[in-house]
Amino acid sequence: MFAIAFAVVLCLLVSVDAKFPEDPKPCKYGDGECIMKLCNTLFSENSAEGDPGLNLMQLDPLKVDRMVISQGESSSPVGITLTFTDNLLYGIKDQRIVKVKGFGRDLTAKHEVKIVTKTFSLVGPYNIQGKVLILPISGTGQSNMTMVNVRAIVSFSGKPLVKNGETYLDVTDLKITMKPESSHYHFSNLFNGDKALGDNMNVFLNENSEAIYKETAKAIDRSFGKLYLGVVKGVFSKLPYAKFFADES
């Protein structure tokens, strides 16, 4: 999940910074097919362990320091504040980019990446307070939130930013939409460790997982969008926009 937001820009950065003879070559502006193939190759071969020679950090599992999902709309049967801290995200290595749009010369244009993956599992400490389909829920402990057969769309846009005579892409807007085929949840230590209540709630959550995800999808997408806007801004601030692509002069 974490790397979805900046998969393409990270791959472009890798291809620019790689120094050895066998390194992948940068793609031309707007060459979606090239960008897609480059990224899929890099992720499948290097995401599990990383590759210092390619300047590619470990992506599977990936550390997620903190993420808050807040669903508080009064009309919704689900109203929760769910906080994940020091989690690990598994599944990046199996993701595949299936379509890329944008990444042309126009810095104000929209960029879009479509991705599919078998599973995404976010594992680690959590805190939750609120209600789920009218039932109260509270707890602090370990959690596992897994999404299966996920289709995701990442889109972002920006504006030119001139620094020291060079033009950078200043990313100003990023959105993520995820559509899993199914989702599964497990939260330990619910209701102050009451095992009976906790077990029943976990059963309830999974029996109603489709309805629960539908109610929380927008909140989940917003949380990831806010989190990774800063990440993508940081990637594009490293180099002038033109440096991410092959020299066509």
UniProtKB/Swiss-Prot annotation:
It holds the Pfam family JHBP. Belongs to the TO family. Disulfide bonds: none annotated. It comes from Drosophila melanogaster. Its main location: secreted. Gene3D superfamilies: Haemolymph juvenile hormone binding protein (3.15.10.30). It is found in: Secreted. The gene is to. GO terms for biological process: adult feeding behavior; behavioral response to starvation; circadian rhythm; feeding behavior; male courtship behavior; mating behavior; response to starvation; rhythmic behavior. SMART domains: JHBP. Induction: Starvation and circadian clock. In the heads of entrained flies, levels fluctuate daily and the cycle phase is delayed with respect to per and tim. Cycling appears to be linked to the endogenous clock rather than light stimuli. Residues 1-18 form the signal peptide. Participates in a novel circadian output pathway that conveys temporal and food status information to feeding-relevant metabolisms and activities. Involved in male courtship behavior. In the brain-associated fat body, transcription is enhanced by the dsx and fru male-specific isoforms and repressed by the dsx female-specific isoform. Expression is largely restricted to head, with limited expression detectable in cardia and crop. In entrained individuals, expression is observed in the brain cortex (region between optic lobe and central complex), photoreceptors and antennae. In asynchronous individuals, expression is seen in third antennal segment and male-specific expression is seen in the brain-associated fat body. This is Protein takeout. GO terms for cellular component: extracellular region; extracellular space.
